[in-house]
C-alpha cells in the first residue's frame, strides 16, 4: 500500500512519500523537488510540469496554470473574473455556468474543464511518486486550502479519480503544516495547551490557523483566510508599476502582448526575491517588445509603498483567527510562518507588530504541507506504524439543512413553511455525523446549504436530497430518522433515511410483569408522541445516540441480572412494542458537480491523452537514438574503428550516415516510431560488425590468458607428485591431460588463423568461444582433481567371544571425514 502526500499548489506542486526511515520529498525527472503546476497543450502531445513550464514562453496561450483558482467556481464569481484578466489562455463560460478552458491540442481547439486539467497534473505527480517508490500509487492524501467550498472539494476528488488516485483524506494545508510541526515534538506539555499560530502565505492566498498542542495530540482552534492575498499579488504590483513606466518611457503596452507579459511577470517575481534581501533591485530585459530593451530600478521603500493596499489586508485574517479561537495575542505562544510569499520583509514586520513576537521559520516553507500530507496518509495506512498522535480538525464553515415542513397534511388545510436548522456549526469537528427526526406522510426534500455566506464567494445552496417514496403501515404521518454526515474530506451529505414504525407483538409474561411492562410502554409511547404535537418536526442529535442500546428492541431495558422465570398458571399473552426499521430511497443533486458518467468519460479521455503522450515520447526517444548513433559512429569511424573497416566500406558508411543526418532534419523530422526504428536497424547492419571486431580485439587477449591459465593449472595438477593427489587414479589423471592437450591444440590452431587475418576481417577466434572452451575444460577437470580422499577405515574393537561390538561400527568414520575436511580447507579450520 502506497503512502504518498501531494501538495497541489497554485504555482508549484510537491510529492512526499513515507518510507521506513521517515518522510522524503521526492525528485521529479529533472531532479527538482518542486514541479510547476502547468499543463501545456501542443500539436502532438501535452507537456506537464517542468516540461510545461519550459514550453510556456513559446506557447503561452495553450499553457494552463493557476488551476486552483478556477476549479469548482462559477464563471460569474468576481474573484474568478479578476483572475482571468491576468491569464494568457482563454476561459469562457460553459453551459452549466462554470468555466471552460480552451486550448489548441492535436491541431484543433478543444475545451477542458478545470477538473480535467487538475486530473492531468495529478496524473503527472502520481508518475513521479511511482518512479521513486517502484510500485503503483493509488492511496494518497491531498492538501487543499481551508477555504475550499464543498463543490471545490468534490472537484478535487473527481480530479483524483481521473488520475487513478484514491484520496484517503483531503486535509487542510494549514492542518498538514501543524501535523508536520507537532508530531516530531518531544517536549509538548501533558496538561497545559501550547498555542501556535501557523501563517501560510502562498502564491495566491493567505491562510491562518491556530492550533493547540498537547502531548500526542493537536486541536485546530480556528481557521481564517484571505483567498486573494499571496505572493503573486506582490508580483502583480511590480508588474503594473513597470508596465506603466515602460508605457511612458518606451511607448509599449506590455499588457497587450502575452509573451511580453509572461517575461515581465517572471522578472518581477525575481525582483521581489532580490528586494527581500537588498534595499534596491535593478531590472533589465532584452527585446521585451517591439525589439526594445527595457531597464528600470526600484527601491524596497518604493515597493512597500505601492504594496500598501495589500499589506493593509494582512491583519484581518489574523484578528479573525484569534477571535474565533477565543484567544488573545498573549495566549499565542509561538508564530510559525511558511509559504512562498512569506519572504516579503514588510509582511514579517506586520506579523511581528501584531503578535508582539518575532515569527519563526523552523519549518521548510515549501515542503511542510507535502510532509504533513504524507504523515496523515501514514497515520491512516495500516501498513505503517506511526507515533501515536491525534489530530482534532475543525470545519471552517457553518452548514444548515432547510426543508418545507411542520405543517399538517393538505387535507387539513395546512400550508408548508420553509424551515432550517444548523447541523454543523462553524468549528464543528471533522468527521461528524448528526441524526434528525422528521414526521412526514409522503416524499419530501432537504436542502444542504451554507448558513453564512459572508466569507464565501459561492452560492449558498450546496445540494438537494429527495427522500421517498415511503408508506406508513398505519396510514399516519411516518417517523423518519435522517442521518447527515460531514466526512473526513469536509464534504456534507445526507447519508441515509430510515422509516421507524412501532409494531405490537405478543409475548408471554407473568401477570406482575405484564402490569409493569404496560406502564413502561405507556410512558414510552407518550414520550414518542411529544415531538409530533409541537411546531417543529425535527430533533437533532449526534448519530451515536440514535441507535438502540443492546437489549432494548422491545422497549424494555435489559437487566444486568436475569432471574429465572418459574412456570406458573398466571402466564398471559400481553402486547409488546417493537420498532421496525425500513430504509427509504434517497436521491442526491449536487449543484455544479460532475455526474458519474461525465467523470467516467473524463477518465477515458485522460487515458487516450496519456497514451498519445507515451507514443510521442517513445517516438522522440527513437529519433534521438538515430541521431545519437549517427554522431557517435561517425566520430568512431575516424578514430578507434578506423582499422576495423576497409577504406571503401568506411567511405560508403560515412556517406550513408550523412544522408541519414540530412534526412532527420528534413523529411524525417516528423516520422513515426516505426520509421526511426527501421532506420536505426539499417545503420546497425553495417556498424555492428565493425563494433564487434573492435570489441573482440580488446577482449581476446584477456580470455586467451584465462584459458591458458586453466590449461596449465590442471596439467600441473595431473602430473604433480603432491600427496594430496595420490588417491586419484592414473587413468583419471590421463583424461585430464588429454583434455588439456586438446584445448591447447584448439587454441593454438585458432590463434594461428586469427594472426593471418587483418583487423577488418571477420574474426576466426571469438572471445565467447574461448570462454566456452575454458568453462568446458573446468567443468570436466574440476570434479576429477578435487575428488576427496576416501575415508580411512579404523579397526573395530573386538567384543567378548571374538565378535565385533555393533555399537562401535559407525563411530570411527566421523573423525576421518573431519580430518579430510581440515586438509582440504585449512582456512576454515583455522578460524
UniProtKB/Swiss-Prot annotation:
Biased composition (Low complexity): 787-800
Residue numbers spanned by region Disordered: 502-579, 784-831
One GO cellular component term noted in the UniProt record for this chain: mitochondrion
Major location (coarse): cytoplasm
Location of this chain's protein in the cell: Cytoplasm; Nucleus
Entry keyword set: ATP-binding, Chaperone, Cytoplasm, Nucleotide-binding, Nucleus, Phosphoprotein, Stress response
Start-end of Basic and acidic residues biased regions: 512-526
Record keyword Lipid biosynthesis present: no
GO molecular function list: adenyl-nucleotide exchange factor activity; ATP binding; ATP-dependent protein folding chaperone
Function: In cooperation with other chaperones, Hsp70s are key components that facilitate folding of de novo synthesized proteins, assist translocation of precursor proteins into organelles, and are responsible for degradation of damaged protein under stress conditions.
Protein's recorded name: Heat shock 70 kDa protein 15
Species the sequence originates in: Arabidopsis thaliana
Amino acid at each position: 500500500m502506497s503512502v504518498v502526500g501531494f501538495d497541489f499548489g497554485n504555482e508549484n506542486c510537491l510529492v512526499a512519500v513515507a518510507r521506513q526511515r521517515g518522510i522524503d520529498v521526492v525528485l521529479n525527472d529533472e531532479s527538482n523537488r518542486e514541479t510547476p503546476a502547468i499543463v501545456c497543450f501542443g500539436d502532438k502531445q501535452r507537456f506537464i510540469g517542468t516540461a510545461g513550464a519550459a514550453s510556456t514562453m513559446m506557447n503561452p496561450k495553450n499553457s494552463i496554470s493557476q488551476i486552483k483558482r478556477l476549479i469548482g467556481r462559477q464563471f460569474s464569481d468576481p474573484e474568478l473574473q479578476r483572475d482571468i484578466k491576468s491569464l494568457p489562455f482563454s476561459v469562457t463560460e460553459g453551459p452549466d455556468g462554470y468555466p471552460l478552458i480552451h486550448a489548441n491540442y492535436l491541431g484543433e481547439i478543444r475545451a477542458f474543464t478545470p477538473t480535467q486539467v487538475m486530473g492531468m497534473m495529478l496524473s503527472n505527480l502520481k508518475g513521479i511518486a511511482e518512479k521513486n517508490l517502484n510500485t503503483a500509487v493509488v492511496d494518497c492524501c491531498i492538501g487543499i486550502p481551508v477555504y475550499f467550498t464543498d463543490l471545490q472539494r468534490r472537484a478535487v476528488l473527481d480530479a483524483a479519480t481521473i488520475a487513478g488516485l484514491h484520496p484517503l483524506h483531503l486535509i487542510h494545508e494549514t492542518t498538514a503544516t501543524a501535523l508536520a510541526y507537532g508530531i516530531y515534538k518531544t517536549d509538548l506539555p501533558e496538561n497545559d495547551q501550547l498555542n501556535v499560530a501557523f501563517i501560510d502565505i502562498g502564491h495566491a492566498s493567505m491562510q491562518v490557523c491556530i492550533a493547540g498542542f498537547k502531548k500526542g495530540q493537536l486541536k485546530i482552534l480556528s481557521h481564517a483566510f484571505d483567498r486573494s492575498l499571496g505572493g503573486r499579488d506582490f508580483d502583480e504590483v511590480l508588474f503594473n508599476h513597470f508596465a506603466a513606466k515602460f508605457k511612458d518611457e518606451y511607448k509599449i503596452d506590455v499588457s497587450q502582448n502575452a509573451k511580453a507579459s509572461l517575461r515581465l511577470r517572471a522578472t518581477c517575481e525575481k525582483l521581489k526575491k532580490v528586494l527581500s534581501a537588498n534595499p534596491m533591485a535593478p531590472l533589465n530585459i532584452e527585446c521585451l517588445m517591439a525589439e526594445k530593451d527595457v531597464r528600470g530600478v526600484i527601491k524596497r521603500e518604493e515597493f512597500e509603498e505601492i504594496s500598501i493596499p495589500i499589506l493593509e489586508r494582512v491583519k484581518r485574517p489574523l484578528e479573525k483567527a484569534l477571535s474565533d479561537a477565543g484567544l488573545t495575542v498573549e495566549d499565542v505562544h509561538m508564530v510559525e510562518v511558511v509559504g512562498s510569499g512569506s519572504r516579503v520583509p514588510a509582511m514579517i514586520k506586520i506579523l511581528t507588530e501584531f503578535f508582539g513576537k518575532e515569527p519563526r521559520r523552523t519549518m521548510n516553507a515549501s515542503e511542510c504541507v507535502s510532509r504533513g500530507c504524507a504523515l496523515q496518509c501514514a497515520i491512516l495506512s495500516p501498513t505503517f506504524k506511526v507515533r501515536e498522535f491525534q489530530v482534532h480538525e475543525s470545519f471552517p464553515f457553518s452548514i444548515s439543512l432547510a426543508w418545507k415542513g411542520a405543517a399538517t397534511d393538505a387535507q387539513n388545510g395546512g400550508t408548508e413553511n420553509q424551515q432550517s436548522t444548523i447541523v454543523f456549526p462553524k468549528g464543528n469537528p471533522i468527521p461528524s455525523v448528526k441524526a434528525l427526526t422528521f414526521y412526514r406522510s409522503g416524499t419530501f426534500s432537504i436542502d444542504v446549504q451554507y448558513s453564512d455566506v459572508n466569507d464565501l464567494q459561492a452560492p449558498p445552496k450546496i445540494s438537494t436530497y429527495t427522500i421517498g417514496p415511503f408508506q406508513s403501515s398505519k396510514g399516519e404521518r411516518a417517523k423518519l430518522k435522517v442521518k447527515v454526515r460531514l466526512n473526513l474530506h469536509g464534504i456534507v451529505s445526507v447519508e441515509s433515511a430510515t422509516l421507524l414504525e412501532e409494531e405490537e407483538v405478543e409475548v408471554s409474561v407473568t401477570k406482575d410483569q405484564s402490569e409493569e411492562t404496560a406502564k413502561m410502554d405507556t410512558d414510552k409511547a407518550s414520550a414518542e408522541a411529544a415531538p409530533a404535537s409541537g411546531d417543529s418536526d425535527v430533533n437533532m442529535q449526534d448519530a451515536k445516540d440514535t441507535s438502540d442500546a443492546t437489549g432494548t428492541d422491545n422497549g424494555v431495558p435489559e437487566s444486568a441480572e436475569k432471574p429465572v422465570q418459574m412456570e406458573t398458571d398466571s402466564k398471559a399473552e400481553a402486547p409488546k412494542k417493537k420498532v421496525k426499521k425500513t430504509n427509504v430511497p434517497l436521491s442526491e443533486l449536487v449543484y455544479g458537480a460532475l455526474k458519474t458518467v461525465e467523470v467516467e468519460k473524463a477518465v477515458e479521455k485522460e487515458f487516450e491523452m496519456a497514451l498519445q503522450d507515451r507514443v510521442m515520447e517513445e517516438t522522440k526517444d527513437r529519433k534521438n537514438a538515430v541521431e545519437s548513433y549517427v554522431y557517435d559512429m561517425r566520430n568512431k569511424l575516424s578514430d578507434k574503428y578506423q582499422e576495423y573497416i576497409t577504406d571503401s566500406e568506411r567511405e560508403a558508411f560515412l556517406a550513408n550516415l550523412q544522408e541519414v543526418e540530412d534526412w532527420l532534419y528534413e523529411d524525417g523530422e516528423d516520422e513515426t516510431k516505426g520509421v526511426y526504428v527501421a532506420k536505426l536497424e539499417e545503420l546497425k547492419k553495417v556498424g555492428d560488425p565493425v563494433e564487434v571486431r573492435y570489441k573482440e580485439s580488446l577482449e581476446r587477449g584477456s580470455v586467451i590468458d584465462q584459458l591458458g591459465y586453466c590449461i596449465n593449472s590442471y596439467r600441473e595438477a595431473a602430473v604433480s607428485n603432491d600427496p594430496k593427489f595420490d588417491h586419484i587414479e592414473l587413468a583419471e589423471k590421463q583424461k585430464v591431460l588429454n583434455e588439456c592437450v586438446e584445448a591447447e591444440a584448439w587454441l593454438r590452431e585458432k590463434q594461428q588463423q586469427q594472426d593471418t587475418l587483418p583487423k577488418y576481417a571477420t574474426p576466426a577466434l571469438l572471445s565467447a568461444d574461448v570462454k566456452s572452451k575454458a568453462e568446458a575444460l573446468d567443468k570436466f577437470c574440476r570434479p576429477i582433481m578435487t575428488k576427496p580422499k576416501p575415508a580411512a577405515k579404523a579397526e573395530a574393537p573386538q567384543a567378548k567371544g571374538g565378535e565385533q561390538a555393533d555399537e562401535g561400527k559407525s563411530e570411527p568414520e566421523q573423525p576421518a571425514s573431519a580430518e579430510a575436511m581440515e586438509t582440504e580447507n585449512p582456512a576454515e579450520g583455522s578460524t
